[in-house]
């Protein structure tokens, strides 16, 4: 891929510009550190858009995650590929177990403020760079209100906690993480505005806005999930 660059780029400004451009794209990914210091960090942010190819679970199992840029996710239900587990809880939504896309355009903002964009041609990469630098950097002001409702009733939740307490008293376990679900019906929502509100409120170092056709994933996490570098894994 051919590369072009711009210098002394502000991370938050360019993040907002990229999010402004995401609405017209079916496949878009933005991963940002929000400027948080980290000894393992290579970039302030990474982004990609356009899909040369979309990869699902079967393609990934047959070697689809070999070298080259790919953006996407591994779903929780993928665990059944590695262990024989009971499916006690119904899956929420219609998300696939895994999905990645090979981007047409890739960009990275390096730690020294250099924005580097790669495309199939230098002319195409330069066109994208100009588009990004000219996009609006304002925070969006669309609807972001969500009213969450618990899946469990109060009685079900208390019953589950009391059962776990009994297991601890019996010595079956000594600690446990218990998760409960909340859902919100989306009537009107600006996903970019919501992500910006989440990111500005948390400044979480592992934040991501991921758009895969009709699926949109927003993440503002303080924790790294996993990093693999050659034969080393950090988690």
State each model region's role.
Residues 1-235:
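Extended alpha-helical targeting/anchoring segments
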